[in-house]
Amino acid sequence: MKKIIILLLATILFTACEYDNYDAPSVTFSGQLLYNDKPFLCDGNDARDIFLFFQEGFGKVDWGTKMHTLADGSYQQLLHSGEYKLTLGNVKYPFEINEFPAGTVGYDSIYYDLKKDVRQDFHITPYYEISDLDAKLEGINIVAKFKVKKVSGTSKPAPRIVKARIYLGINHFVNSKSPVVAEQEVDANFSGDGELTVSIDAIKYRTGYKENYRDNAFYRVALELENIPDYYLFSETKEITGIPEEFDDITNQYLKNYKQPFNVVSYFPDS
């Protein structure tokens, strides 16, 4: 009896191994998002990917394979060889990808029969350009200023800009996942061409990362467009230096109704 049980278990184990031993993915799909033949800068947050591979056919239940897009607009995905369709996540974006025109529902898809590595670039037209980004320390605030230009040539009118954001990080990897962020409403009368300003309390940078004694920070700004809450237009990543290790002033972290300028002496006179 024991021999029969052992033989039965061995047969089950062998069968399970036979089914589990699939070939590893061996085909690489890669490329670059381009705007005016230059790399298009993206969010870079892996929770906000753009592309989705899926397969169709009898017996296939495929929820899709997301392809991560880095902040520099490059992407690379390892796949099994086979037939795929590539499309975009079914959300609105602050740009148009020429190869994926938007329909009434969702986006078009592109068919690929992947038998070997494929390099495919895609061309983007954003609704707005961000340029001339610069940030300075003003009191306890990091103040970023940048220019915005509405882009012509899109198939749909550009939605208006509703919010500007600034993200701070301790390295070059700054995106919408970065924990230190501030946002500012954009005037509804803003035409889409001009300068915008967004600021953040520097103490949020100090307290937002553990044991953060750095005198520098990396930052990016982003634009949120009307009715497009899931993806933003991002700037390049830049660095600001000269951030004090300690702040002598009292800030809104401790005083609810704090507004600059604040005179410490007037509230705490000498005894």
Where are these regions (language model features)?
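Short, acidic Ser/Thr/Gly-rich low-complexity loop/linker segments typical of extracellular
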Residues: G57-S74
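Short strand-edge motifs at loop-to-beta-strand transitions and within beta-strands
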Residues: G73-Q77, D108, V118-Q120, G192-I200
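Extracellular beta-sheet/turn segments enriched in Thr/Pro/Gly and aliphatic residues
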Residues: V105-A135, S266-P269
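Ser/Thr/Gly/Pro-rich, low-complexity flexible regions
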Residues: D134-S271
